[in-house]
C-alpha cells in the first residue's frame, strides 16, 4: 500500500511507515494513493460473509501484500471481538450500535486494530503512543494497548471537561498507561500533541506515534463497520440508504465516505455536529472560519478545528464528487435534550452524540429512504446527563461498574509543552 502526505504529495510512504509515523512532514495527513473499488457483484458476495472475514477482505484491498492475508485476518479477529448490531428505532430508521466493545465506544474498533497493526509492525522496537482525547479515544487506546509489550501510552485530556465515568475508564489502569489532565480545552491538548511531534529529539528518543483518528490504521478499521451495518439491512433499505454521522474530528465520516468509494451502496451522508459547527457553516457558505470551541452535552464533538477534514476534501476531489452532495446539520443542546426524550418515547435510550445524529437524520430523511444513525457510545458513559435529561436511572454496564471506585492515577499539568516534555522524558 502506498500513501501520500496531503501537504506534500512527494512524500510517499508504505502502510507500515504511515502507521508508525502517524503524521507526515508539516503535520500532513496520509491518504491512500490507490482507492480500490469493488464491483456490485463483489459487494453482494462480501455482504454475505461474517464480520471478521469481510473486514479482512476490505482491509486487504488497501493494505495489499504488506501484511499476509492470514496474519491480517488473525489480527482483525483479535481486534473485532465484539458485534456492531443495527438496532431498530423506527420502521425507516436504525441505529448502528458501535458501543459493544470493552470501552463501550466506537473507538474500540479503530484503537484495537491500530494496536494490533502497530505491535505487528514494530516487533521488538519500543513505541510511545501520544494522543489527545475528548473522552472516548483515551479509553479505547488505553484498553487496546494495555499490557502489550514494548508500548508506552501517554494520553492528554482536558481537565474537568470529560465525564467522571469516562475518566475512570482510562485513568485507573496504570501499568504502561500514563494519563495527563491538562488545564485547557481539547484543542489545547491537540496543540500539545502537535508540538511533541514537531520535536525531533523527543520523537526519536521515545519512538513517538499518535493514536487519534489521524492514524491511517484507525481510519481503515472504521470503514468495516459501515459494511457490517449494510449487511444487516433488507435489500429495500440498502437501495435508499442515508447515513447520519455524529462528527467531531470527522474520522468517522471520512471512513463512511471511503466505504462509499469502495462501492458500498450509500445514497447520502449527513455530517451532524453540535454548535461547534465549523463544517456545517463551511458547507453552507464556503467560508472556513472556526470559532472558539464551546462546551456542550455531546462533549466528544466539541472540536472547532476537525483534523480529518482535509481527507474528506481530498476524497471528494479524487472521486470528482461535489461537496454540496454532503448533508449537514448543527444541533444545539436544547434540541439534543428534546431529541433524547423523543427517542425514549420511541423505546430507545440514547445519549447526546447519537441524538445529534438522529435529529439531523430525522429532519432530512425523505419518504422511501431508510436512515441509519451511528450510536458511538453507550448511554451509561454519559450517565449523569442522560439520567438528568430522561429522569430515570441507568444501570452501569460491568465495564464501567468495575472501575467506578478505583482511584484516578492522572498527572495534572498546565497547557505548557515544556512541562509535558519533561514528564515524558522522565517517564521513559
Enumerate the predicted regions with their spans.
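PLP-dependent amino-acid enzyme catalytic core
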Residues: 1-428
Amino acid at each position: 500500500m502506498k500513501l501520500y502526505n496531503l501537504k506534500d504529495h512527494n512524500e510517499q510512504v508504505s502502510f507500515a511507515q504511515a502507521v508508525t509515523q502517524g503524521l507526515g512532514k508539516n503535520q500532513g495527513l496520509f491518504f491512500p494513493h490507490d482507492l480500490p473499488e469493488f464491483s456490485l457483484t463483489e459487494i453482494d458476495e462480501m455482504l454475505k460473509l461474517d464480520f471478521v472475514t469481510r473486514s479482512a477482505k476490505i482491509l486487504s484491498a488497501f493494505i495489499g501484500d504488506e501484511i499476509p492475508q492470514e496474519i491480517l485476518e488473525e489480527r482483525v479477529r483479535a481486534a473485532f471481538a465484539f458485534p456492531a448490531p443495527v438496532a431498530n428505532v423506527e420502521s425507516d430508521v436504525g441505529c448502528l450500535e458501535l458501543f459493544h466493545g470493552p470501552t463501550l465506544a466506537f473507538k474500540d474498533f479503530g484503537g484495537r486494530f491500530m494496536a494490533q497493526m502497530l505491535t505487528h509492525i514494530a516487533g521488538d522496537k519500543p513505541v510511545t503512543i501520544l494522543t489527545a482525547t475528548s473522552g472516548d479515544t483515551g479509553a479505547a487506546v488505553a484498553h487496546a494497548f494495555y499490557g502489550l509489550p514494548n508500548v508506552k501510552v501517554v494520553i492528554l485530556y482536558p481537565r474537568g471537561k470529560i465525564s467522571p465515568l469516562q475518566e475512570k475508564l482510562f485513568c485507573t489502569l496504570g501499568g504502561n498507561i500514563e494519563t495527563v489532565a491538562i488545564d485547557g480545552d481539547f484543542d489545547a491538548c491537540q496543540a500539545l500533541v502537535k508540538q511533541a511531534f514537531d520535536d525531533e529529539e523527543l520523537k526519536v528518543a521515545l519512538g513517538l506515534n499518535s493514536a487519534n483518528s489521524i492514524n491511517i490504521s484507525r481510519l481503515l478499521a472504521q470503514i468495516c463497520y459501515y459494511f457490517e451495518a449494510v449487511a444487516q439491512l433488507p435489500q429495500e433499505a440498502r437501495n435508499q440508504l442515508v447515513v447520519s454521522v455524529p462528527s467531531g474530528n470527522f474520522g468517522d465520516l471520512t471512513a463512511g465516505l471511503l466505504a462509499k468509494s469502495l462501492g458500498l451502496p450509500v445514497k447520502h451522508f449527513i455530517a451532524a455536529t453540535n454548535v461547534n459547527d465549523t463544517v456545517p457553516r463551511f458547507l453552507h457558505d464556503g467560508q472556513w472560519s472556526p470559532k472558539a470551541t464551546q462546551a456542550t452535552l455531546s462533549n466528544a464533538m466539541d472540536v472547532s478545528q476537525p483534523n480529518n477534514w482535509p481527507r474528506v476534501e481530498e476524497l471528494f476531489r479524487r472521486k470528482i464528487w461535489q461537496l454540496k452532495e454532503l448533508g449537514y446539520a448543527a444541533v444545539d443542546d436544547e434540541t439534543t435534550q428534546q431529541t433524547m426524550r423523543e427517542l425514549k418515547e420511541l423505546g430507545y435510550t440514547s445519549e447526546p452524540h447519537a441524538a445529534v445524529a438522529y435529529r439531523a437524520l430525522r429532519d432530512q430523511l425523505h419518504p422511501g429512504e431508510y436512515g441509519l444513525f451511528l450510536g458511538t457510545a453507550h448511554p451509561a458513559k454519559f450517565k449523569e446527563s442522560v439520567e438528568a435529561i430522561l429522569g430515570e436511572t441507568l444501570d452501569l454496564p460491568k465495564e464501567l461498574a468495575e472501575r467506578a471506585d478505583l482511584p484516578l492515577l492522572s498527572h495534572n499539568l498546565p497547557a505548557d509543552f515544556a512541562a509535558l516534555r519533561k514528564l515524558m522524558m522522565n517517564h521513559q
